[in-house]
Amino acid sequence: MAGEDEHLPQIKSPDSVTSRLTRREALLQLLRAGGIAASAAGTGIWLSKRSVRPAAASAQQARKDHRITADQQWPQLTVAQYAMDGRGPQPGEPRALVQKALENLGGMGRFVTHQDVVVIKPNIAWDRTPEQAANTNPEFVAEVVRQCWQAGARRVIVTDVSCNEAQRCFHRSGIEAAARAAGAEVTLPDPEKFREVDMGGVALKSWPVFTPFLEADKILNLPIAKHHELTGATLGMKNWYGILGGQRNRLHQQIHQSLADLAAFMLPTLTIMDCYRILLRNGPTGGNLEDVALKKTVVAGTDPVALDAYVAKAYWDLDAEHLPYLRLAANRGLGTVEFEKLAIKTSQLS
């Protein structure tokens, strides 16, 4: 039986995670992040050299707003979680969490309608297994695909622009097989299918974007909650780096402004965040199972700022002071950092 609770769940942060940095530590993190950027730049560089269609007189400019009309009948944020009773991962739990979260928000039919072309954006950035918690859980992805079909979608596409070699990432993450089994089209990044877009941002000006994200009717963001060496956490808005080609490591120089620019450009229909396993330390790549924590949770909603703020506080005790992109995004009217003021629907599964 699933217990229902309309109140905000108690938030606790892991004792082992430090949220405040000295200036020296911050500089060291920047240096380490530079190494990550260099290792990840292989994908970005090949895309930057070969990916962009011949330019028109000017770059395409389009804010991709896929939001649905707000309905006060439904919460803007929901949390579904299993009781942490000492049992390890159980078959079917990720699927049940997605189902409960969508039920709390009014069902997938509220977000996806007949004949929609839906693009699902998991995190498939790294050559890692599901147990390493560097990519979105494949069971989450498969269930979202099934829900889209049930809602009447015409096409369901699962894609991402990986940091490591894409074929290995899609395969080893388990996402390619799970998504295909659920009936989705799985699209790997193709250097011929990027389009230069004028994003009109402060840090992000003109940049190549993978075309499935420019042609969808609805876009569902499926990030995984992870530690990030540079920002402290990588959550929903950081997942939009995976729509870009080019030399993405350059964006780390103004990472918080870049994240706010991306959030203003790509406004998803719905965000469903995988917190089944989270990467508490040494993100975003991970690799050591000791850095992974089992939380058996999904957080979903229509306010991307509130969702990121909630998860950052819950697992890393980070707020908008530590994550400036949250305040930048809120100041642009993209959501609220004050998630405590929202009606949050929570469900405990057993």
Residue map of PLM features:
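N-terminal and secondary-structure boundary signal
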Residues: 2-350
